[in-house]
């Protein structure tokens, strides 16, 4: 206690001339130290406590009994008449000490000793009776230039928060519960703080009036709606004016924004849900135009209203492509987006599909099969990707079920199914069948299209001429559109180069035929047991395929993905030490798709396959120092989400003659066989007199067992266009090496002066995010010279792929926090890579606004 130190210094000071001892009278008329005086111990000093009934004893002690020792005389008694003071004569030659508790507390907390601070401190005597509370106050290390900060700190301690700002304590009060009577923070304030001060702070910061029956759920509604008024028009909030304080809008917006980016965002979500349910905000927002809702961030139901609107319209065959894209791009950087991101992802894919439909509404009228094949590889495949990504999003949303939106999402899936299956697959398939009908009846290998049957000679042999090792990853059912996504990721995420091309698969587009075609051979043969041979050798299984590989190189290796990953690094290196060619067999997609119980997870398996192949490439390049890697597949696949209608199924009765093999998408039979509504395809390229039949377009052949929605074996572009990715790992010393870099963001606005608490700035993405330039996410905020944030934080995702520079701009709104800004000081706009402290750009600004923290009360 500082008072003990002060007294000790007084007693240790030199005595006046002719004085042999020191007597100090401590007057404490308010009895602030009455309970602690007995704890005071000062070396060589005795303590005498006056009680009002020991006056005679005290007088005798100090004047007769003990005239040698130093004495501290504690006197809590007030005398109406000095004549009542028995020790007045002794006081006249003694010293006086006064130390009221307020002064001591002010000194202890480095507070200015002025009337305003003394008045504030007097409100909290009960607070300071507890050492733990007093210690927590000290731990805040506040600079008490005003009584307002003391009030805030007291509320912070009693609310259980270290956020000792006006917004921080208001947030803490609400986090303690919306039931005012049961709120533990309020109960603490009522006992040890000052409830009136708490309400005055709330009113000054938020504009919320303390009226009879005022509650914290009302306060929460007021804060959230006042914050929302910053981003929504008055007309949209008509009827809610009593819950909004326009002069406090920027302060409430800053409070909510700060809360959103804190560790208590889940609690804010729950509070916002309570408010929107109580005020029926979803019903209100359902009637407002989507454009008006786009920037509203406070309430989760806004996302649901936007999504519901679009999904309802889609179910009614109204698809606003540009509006959906704009909404998704706007909402994705907002707080509650992640909770509904799969719904937005699904909507975006619907918009992509609709745009594709709009661009090709006249159909796919290309006159030559080779040109249609190329058009599919260049552009048409994207529709397959959109469909896959839609259903991936749908599947993920069902795992995070929202009863509000789930049924609508399924209605949208019906629309998507109709667009994809009935328009795209049937229209594209019909044109492909039309162009290839006669060609296929001549030969299963179409002219002017690269053939899977010559993969080894065309792709591997040229790479071996440089005496390098070639790794070949064969991923079962890695269809072209999935490989296209993989190729883009390899370019963007690795130091290597990746180029995608395509070839026509063997017919049937099934594993035994495709796997054989990818091996080195002079002749593929289909024997009497329907086994596919390469130059008379079996190709069934990894062991058999390795034997075929060894015919062109004794050290060549065939191994499965799982076997390779299970090996240690030294084992991997030993395995391929003598190999010129290494075939690695990967089977994730087909393994899932071929099984009826799991076929509906095939699109999820596609995502897994992409991740696994990327990992496999890291193993090859890092552990095995591989440079040349080819990624291909045995075949593609067709998949439709909805069960097919009877009209899309063909019965075996359509076939006359002896059938040797029948699957959903092909038949192998004797030459004499005939099949209605199918394309006859000779199989002479496998040295057999047997022939095949393939159903038209999207039709499946009925059979028992196996998958129905996931199929392959036929001649649709989705099945027979087989990808070839040529990946070359590049070292930084290579002249052709191009490193991956993130798309940069640059401030476009010319002015460097802020003159309003809410202001907007324009930013520019310097390059299109494609190839080796990858998308990047940035956090942007204003700070003072010390780096302390003085504004909210906004996020920009720099992933625009437009070649037009003007299409790569961002218009972003910021809100300053409650603070005093000096126009003579420098402030800085900071652009950081999200999730890091890496500042990629910093621009100096001045702030000139009349915006002073006025919470000194």
At which residue positions do the language-model features occur?
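…; additionally, a secondary subgroup of soluble metalloenzymes is captured
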Residues: 1-469, 479-629, 633-857
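Ligand-binding pocket scaffold of soluble enzyme catalytic domains
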Residues: 476
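Beta1/beta-strand and adjacent pyrophosphate-binding region of the FAD-binding site
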Residues: 473
């Amino acid at each position: 206690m500082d008072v003990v130190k002060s007294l000790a210094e007084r007693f240790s000071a030199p005595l006046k001339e002719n004085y042999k001892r020191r007597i100090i009278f401590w007057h404490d008329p308010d009895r602030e130290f009455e309970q602690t005086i007995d704890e005071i111990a000062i070396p060589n000093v005795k303590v005498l406590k006056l009680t009002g009934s020991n006056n005679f004893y005290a007088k005798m002690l100090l004047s007769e009994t003990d005239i040698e020792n130093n004495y501290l005389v504690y006197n809590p008694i007030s005398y109406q008449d000095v004549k009542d003071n028995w020790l007045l004569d002794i006081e006249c030659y003694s010293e006086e000490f006064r130390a009221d508790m307020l002064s001591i507390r002010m000194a202890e907390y480095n507070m200015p000793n002025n009337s305003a601070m003394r008045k504030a401190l007097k409100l909290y005597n009960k607070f300071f009776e507890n050492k733990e509370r007093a210690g927590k106050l000290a731990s805040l290390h506040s600079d008490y230039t005003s009584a307002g900060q003391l009030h805030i700190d007291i509320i912070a301690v009693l609310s259980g928060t270290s956020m000792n700002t006006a917004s921080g304590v208001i947030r803490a009060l609400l986090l303690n519960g919306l039931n005012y009577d049961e709120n533990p923070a309020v109960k603490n304030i009522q006992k040890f703080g000052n409830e009136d001060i708490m309400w005055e702070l709330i009113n000054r910061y938020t504009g919320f009036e303390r009226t009879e029956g005022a509650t914290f759920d009302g306060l929460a509604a007021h804060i959230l709606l006042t914050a929302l008024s910053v981003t929504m028009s008055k007309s949209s909030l008509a009827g809610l004016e009593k819950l909004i304080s326009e002069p406090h809008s920027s302060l409430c917006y800053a409070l909510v924004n700060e809360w959103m980016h804190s560790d208590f965002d889940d609690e804010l979500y729950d509070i916002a849900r309570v408010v929107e349910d109580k005020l029926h905000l979803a019903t209100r927002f359902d009637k407002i135009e989507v454009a008006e809702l786009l920037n509203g961030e406070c309430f989760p139901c806004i996302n649901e209203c936007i999504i519901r609107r679009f999904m309802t319209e889609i179910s009614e065959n109204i698809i606003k492509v540009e509006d959906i894209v704009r909404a998704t791009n706007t909402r994705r950087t907002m707080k509650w987006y992640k909770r509904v991101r799969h719904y937005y992802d699904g909507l975006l894919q619907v918009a992509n599909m609709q745009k594709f439909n709009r661009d090709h509404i006249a159909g796919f009228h290309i006159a030559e099969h080779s040109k249609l094949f190329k058009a599919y590889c260049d552009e048409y495949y994207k529709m397959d990707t959109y469909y896959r990504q839609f259903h991936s999003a749908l599947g993920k949303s069902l795992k995070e079920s929202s009863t509000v939106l789930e049924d609508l999402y399924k209605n949208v899936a019906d629309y998507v199914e109709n667009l994809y299956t009935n328009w795209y697959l049937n229209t594209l398939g019909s044109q492909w069948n039309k162009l290839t009908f006669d060609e296929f009846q001549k030969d299963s290998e179409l002219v002017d299209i690269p053939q899977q049957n010559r993969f080894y000679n065309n792709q591997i042999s040229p790479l071996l001429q440089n005496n390098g090792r070639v790794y070949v990853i064969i991923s079962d059912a890695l269809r072209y559109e999935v490989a296209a996504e993989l190729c883009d990721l390899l370019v963007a995420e690795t130091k290597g180069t990746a180029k995608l091309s395509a070839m026509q698969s063997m017919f049937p587009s099934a594993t035994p035929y495709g796997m054989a075609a990818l091996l080195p051979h002079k002749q593929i043969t289909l024997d009497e047991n329907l086994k596919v041979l390469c130059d008379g050798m079996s190709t069934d299984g990894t062991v058999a395929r390795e034997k075929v590989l060894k015919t062109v190189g004794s050290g060549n290796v065939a191994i499965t993905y799982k076997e390779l990953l299970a090996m240690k690094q030294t084992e991997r290196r030993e395995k391929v030490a003598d190999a010129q060619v290494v075939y690695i067999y990967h089977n994730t997609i087909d393994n899932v798709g071929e099984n009826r119980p799991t076929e509906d997870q095939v699109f999820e398996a596609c995502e897994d396959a992409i991740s696994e192949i990327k990992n496999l490439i890291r193993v090859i390049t890092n552990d095995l120092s591989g440079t040349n890697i080819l990624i291909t597949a045995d075949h593609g696949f067709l998949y439709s989400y909805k069960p097919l209608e009877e009209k899309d199924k063909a019965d075996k009765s359509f076939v006359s003659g002896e059938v040797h093999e029948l699957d959903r998408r092909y038949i192998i039979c004797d030459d004499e066989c005939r099949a209605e509504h199918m394309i006859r395809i000779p199989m002479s390229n496998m040295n057999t007199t047997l022939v095949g039949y393939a159903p038209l377009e999207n039709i499946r052949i009925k059979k028992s067992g196996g998958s129905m929605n996931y199929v392959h074996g036929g001649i649709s572009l989705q099945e027979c266009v087989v990808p070839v990715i040529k990946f070359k790992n590049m070292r930084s010393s290579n002249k052709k090496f191009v490193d991956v870099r993130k798309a940069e963001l640059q401030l476009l606005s010319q002015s460097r002066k802020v003159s309003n608490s809410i202001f907007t700035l324009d930013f520019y993405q310097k390059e299109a995010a494609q190839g080796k330039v990858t998308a990047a996410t940035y956090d942007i905020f204003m700070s003072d010279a010390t780096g302390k944030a003085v504004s909210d934080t906004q996020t920009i995702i720099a992933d625009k792929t437009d070649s037009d520079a003007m299409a790569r701009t961002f218009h972003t709104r910021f809100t300053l926090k409650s603070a005093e800004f000096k126009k003579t000081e420098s402030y800085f706009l900071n652009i950081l890579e999200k999730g890091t402290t890496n500042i990629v750009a910093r621009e100096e600004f001045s702030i000139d606004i009349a915006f002073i923290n006025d919470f000194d009360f």
